[in-house]
Regions:
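Hydrophobic, membrane-interfacing alpha helices
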Residues: 1-332
Length: 332
């Protein structure tokens, strides 16, 4: 019996051929986009969004490519990869920027990308930018939730060490993180796994050991039981973020949109920025920082970036308030 659940999800659902595989990560994004399309079309049909229902599919497709993928990937590269691995990691492998199927997407980058995309889309199609953004912000948490579930399945972006937490999870992927205490236990864990499953491949190379061990962990209960003592129990922070930044935020914004159909443009966008920043800052205290702290032991990179979202929240809420006051004055 394990003291704590040892993460053993396989990020690959099944392999097709020639190294091409269907991954949970890609499926999560697809589910988010399809779900967003369904919800946005419903809002459009109820006249609660500035676009016509027939334009919803094209808008979602363009937003996915130009906003989420490009913005999210560039955000990861500039906010996380370069500060962690240095500029040379990009200069020596520039094509790696486009390998989104390997993971590495920043939600702050995706949000910024969507802001830029919707601004130019609104100008081209002569619709309200804030009205366009309001609809997108209502459904965006669904995509965020799907992304966090994929992070959990991949065993990435795991939480901080949490001894005594009943629902803690042990992540074998921590063996490959040089900053994690588990990395110093890789050799011992590998030897224990070999004894538990002699049929497992052997290797003297550190990189090979990590890959072999994590693959065996997904297939062998004996290996899981053998490596469990060498892993630290951690917060499943991906699930916390999925619940708050995804499920709770989606419910709040959807209720506001339905209950207040004549809410001024910008209100929902402002609420999204403010609530997302609050939930993200809260959840970051349970998440293992991806890169160096902005302020040691006090402020993570995710929290630092989220602080700026309050500025956007204030701007959009201020715009909504002014719009509301003008409409009241003109109706008087």
């Amino acid at each position: 019996v394990f003291a704590t659940y040892v993460h053993d999800f396989d990020p690959v659902i099944f392999e097709i051929a020639w190294g091409i595989a269907l991954r949970w990560y890609g499926l999560a994004y697809l589910a988010g986009f399809l779900g967003g399309y369904v919800l946005l079309k419903r809002l459009a049909e109820r006249k609660l969004w500035v676009l016509e229902p027939a334009k919803t599919a094209d808008f979602i497709a363009a937003a996915a490519l130009l906003g989420v993928f490009i913005g999210g990937r560039l955000g990861y590269v500039f906010f996380y990869q370069i500060p962690r691995d240095g500029l040379d990691s990009v200069l020596h492998n520039p094509l790696g920027i486009f390998k989104v199927w390997q993971g590495g997407m920043a939600s702050h980058g995706g949000i910024l990308g969507l802001m830029i995309f919707t601004f130019f889309y609104a100008k081209k199609h002569k619709v309200s930018w804030t009205g366009l953004g309001d609809g997108l912000c209502v459904v965006a948490p669904l995509g965020l939730m799907c992304g966090r579930l994929a992070n959990f399945i991949n065993g990435e972006l795991y939480g901080r060490i949490a001894h005594g937490l009943p629902w803690a999870v042990k992540f074998p992927s921590a063996f490959g993180d040089s900053k994690a205490p588990e990395s110093g236990q890789l050799h011992s864990a590998f030897q224990a796994a070999l004894e538990a499953d002699p049929g497992m491949l052997n290797s003297d190379r550190i990189d090979d050991k990590f890959q072999i061990l994590t693959e065996a962990n997904r297939e062998s209960d004996a290996v899981n039981q053998a490596i469990e003592p060498f892993l630290e129990p951690r917060h499943p922070s991906q699930l916390y973020e999925g619940l708050l930044e995804g499920g709770v935020l989606l419910a709040i914004l959807w209720i506001v949109r339905i209950k207040f159909p004549k809410a001024p443009n910008g209100l929902l966008t402002g609420l999204f920025f403010g609530l997302y920043a609050t939930f993200r800052i809260f959840c970051e205290q349970f998440r293992e920082p991806d890169v160096a702290w902005v302020i040691d032991g006090v402020l993570t990179k995710g929290q630092f970036l989220s602080i700026f979202m309050y500025v956007f929240a204030a701007a959009f809420l201020g715009h909504a308030y002014k719009t509301y006051k003008r409409s009241k004055a003109s109706a008087a």
